[in-house]
A protein has these predicted regions:
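Alpha-helical transmembrane segments within multi-pass membrane transporters and channels
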Residues: 87-128, 270-271
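Conserved small/polar residues in nucleotide/adenosyl-binding loops
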Residues: 303-306
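Structural signal for alpha-helical transmembrane segments and their membrane-water exit/capping regions
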Residues: 19-34, 62, 134-139, 176-183
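Transmembrane helix-bundle core of multi-pass membrane transporters
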Residues: 115, 119-181, 210-211, 231-236, ...
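Transmembrane alpha-helical segments in multi-pass inner-membrane proteins
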Residues: 220, 234-297
Length: 306
């Protein structure tokens, strides 16, 4: 493959995002809806998905996956709300949210890496358990519809574009540095691309799997916090689809699900926003259920054509 062709292929996800944004703005304007309101919705949803997906890159690079990330985000946000309502301590709320995200991911990694339980089994089980616990807490404390919440003034000063973009940029910059400029990142790609050769070279898969899941857990914690910044309440449906959406977003961003050397951090951000924009376009044109199904079909086509 020539250098120019590689550059063109690498640029496709960015071009697709620009085209999708243009189409989205055109559809919203043609229907007479408020463009600023819809842009805000896309922006906030895209920020959360991109942050969680960026951490998840460290899992997918190994050729593994975790579909419980959405449930973990819900669980972390739920514990954060409970913590603040009990203590009125903002800093403690953030610490609890981050720790909850990290612990949830580490449990998955330990079960999969140390006890050799298939990743699919562990993540599906964790998704069910975390969703059930969070739903029970939410319905008990506030009801399934109303949910539980913190006072809006607690996070109101953070609910602005500058803060959200700043958090995303800092998190992505940290992940890019770790992924592309440290021995850990290079070895992760090696393990994902050729696990047998990596093992023969003395690289322990379990070590990198645990560290990868840990970083994904940090992303879950940050994503849960940003969810509360956007809407300081949690319901049983909060972050419900994030786990599956991450897989679609990564493909949209130009990264193969199989991981390895072709893994890219930017795929999470570009793909995350592309997925959110496409999903909102389809919601505007057809019913949401069909729209979600179409996004899955498109992602499959992109993956198989990789």
């Amino acid at each position: 493959m020539t250098k120019n062709k590689k550059m063109m292929i690498s640029a496709l996800p960015f071009v697709a995002l620009v085209v999708l944004l243009a189409v989205f703005c055109g559809i919203v304007s043609s229907k007479g809806y408020r463009l600023d309101m819809y842009i805000k919705i896309v922006f906030n949803e895209g920020i959360v998905l991109s942050i969680v997906a960026t951490g998840a890159i460290f899992i997918y690079t190994l050729g593994s996956f975790d579909i419980s990330l959405g449930a973990a985000t819900l669980f972390a946000a739920t514990l954060g709300v409970l913590t603040y309502n009990a203590t009125e301590n903002f800093a403690l709320m953030i610490i609890v949210i981050l720790l909850a995200g990290i612990v949830c991911s580490l449990v998955n990694s330990v079960l999969a890496s140390i006890f050799h339980i298939p990743v699919f089994v562990t993540t599906v089980a964790m998704m069910s358990v975390l969703s059930a616990i969070a739903s029970q807490i939410i319905t008990t404390k506030g009801g399934a519809v109303g949910g539980i919440s913190i006072p809006s003034e607690v996070v109101k000063h953070l609910d602005n574009s500058a803060f959200k973009i700043g958090v995303l940029v800092i998190w992505v910059a940290i992940c890019v540095f770790v992924f592309d400029y440290t021995k850990f990142g290079r070895r992760e790609k090696f393990v994902g691309g050729n696990p047998i050769c990596a093992q023969l070279s003395g690289i322990k898969y379990n070590t990198y799997a645990i560290l990868g899941f840990l970083l994904a857990g940090v992303g879950v914690g940050i994503g849960a916090f940003m969810t509360l910044v956007y809407t300081p309440s949690v319901t049983t449906t909060t972050a419900g689809d994030i786990g599956m959406n991450i897989m679609v977003a990564i493909v949209f961003g130009g990264m193969p699900i199989s991981g390895g050397a072709r893994s890219k951090i930017y795929a999470a951000v570009v793909g995350g926003f592309s997925y959110i924009v496409l999903n909102n376009i389809l919601d505007l044109l057809i019913d949401s259920t069909s729209g979600y199904g179409i996004t899955q079909i498109v992602s499959c086509l992109l993956y198989t054509s990789d």
